[in-house]
């Protein structure tokens, strides 16, 4: 298939409108956002501008230049203070502990409103700790890999007493491809899916896998809990499995090995 890259900030309302008017999109997959829990504490306005205003611009474009399906990235962080695990899409998600999480919850509410008002099929996908090649440099897999290979200390928050549902990028993409082809046919065509490995990993075990893969020992700097963080993320993927017969399956050992191989090649280590 043909591919074109067009650089545009989706807070640019006029530019985005012109793009939709000229291209006549069938499906829109929005993975653009100001991401990250900790950075949202330092730079809150960036999150409102990108994640709320930018998403509103996108919804308006889908309204005025109708599409068959809008799929957008939500986040596991919207589950906030929920202590019930694993997290299911039907669980309440009204207690965010970061502005980032609040903006992602806002996206879901805004999408529901546009699905109800204008019949736009929208699907929010709650990603759980995505990692792999081309991953964000501010996330633990990249930070830990870089530090361990360079012999620098790593910051281990909450003294390592955390669990994350690490999900390999290929599994995320496979799940997205299933979802994209199946917009909701409900009277209000709005839906939500979790995509996660459904196998949370202790942070210290995660570090051990990187150490074993890299053949080096981490220098650990134990830290307290960071504001905006949660102790555990854990996806219930029953809805994804029931609707599409799909479940992410890449083990943390296999995923880190693939990530390590890419990292070494990319950075010529």
Describe every region a protein language model picked out.
Residues 1-130, 246, 262, 266-269:
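N-terminal Rossmann-like NAD(P)+-binding domain of SDR-like oxidoreductases, especially those catalyzing
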Residues 8-9, 148-269:
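C-terminal substrate-binding subdomain of Rossmann-fold SDR/epimerase-dehydratase oxidoreductases
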Residues 39-40, 81-83, 134, 166, ...:
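Short glycine-/acidic-enriched loop or helix-start segments at secondary-structure transitions
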Residues 95-103, 127, 133, 137-141, ...:
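The catalytic Tyr-centered alpha-helix of NAD(P)H-dependent dehydrogenases
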Residues 106, 110, 114, 144, ...:
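Hydrophobic alpha-helix immediately C-terminal to the catalytic Tyr-X-X-X-Lys motif of short-chain
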């Amino acid at each position: 298939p043909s591919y074109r890259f067009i650089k545009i900030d989706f807070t640019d309302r006029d530019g985005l409108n012109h793009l939709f008017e000229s291209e006549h999109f069938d499906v829109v997959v929005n993975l653009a956002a100001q991401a990250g829990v900790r950075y949202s504490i330092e730079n809150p306005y960036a999150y409102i501008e990108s994640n709320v205003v930018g998403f509103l611009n996108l919804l308006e474009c889908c309204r005025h230049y109708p599409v068959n399906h809008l799929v957008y990235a939500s986040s596991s962080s919207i589950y906030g203070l929920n202590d019930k695990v694993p997290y299911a899409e039907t669980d309440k998600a009204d207690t965010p502990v970061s502005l980032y999480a609040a903006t992602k919850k806002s996206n879901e509410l805004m999408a529901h409103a546009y699905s109800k008002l204008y019949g736009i099929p929208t699907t929010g996908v709650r990603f759980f700790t995505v990692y792999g090649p081309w991953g964000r440099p501010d996330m633990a897999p990249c930070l830990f890999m870089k530090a361990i290979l360079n012999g620098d200390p790593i910051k281990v928050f909450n003294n390592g007493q955390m669990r994350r549902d690490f999900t390999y990028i290929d599994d995320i993409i496979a799940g997205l491809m299933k979802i994209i082809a199946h917009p909701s046919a409900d009277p209000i065509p709005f839906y939500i899916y979790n995509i996660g490995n459904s196998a949370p990993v202790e942070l210290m075990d995660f570090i051990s896998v990187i150490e074993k893969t890299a053949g080096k020992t981490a220098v650990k700097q134990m830290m307290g809990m960071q504001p905006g963080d949660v102790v555990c993320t854990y996806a219930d993927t029953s809805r994804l499995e029931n609707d599409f017969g799909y479940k992410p399956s890449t083990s943390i050992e296999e995923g880190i090995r693939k990530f390590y191989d890419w990292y070494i090649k990319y950075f010529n280590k």
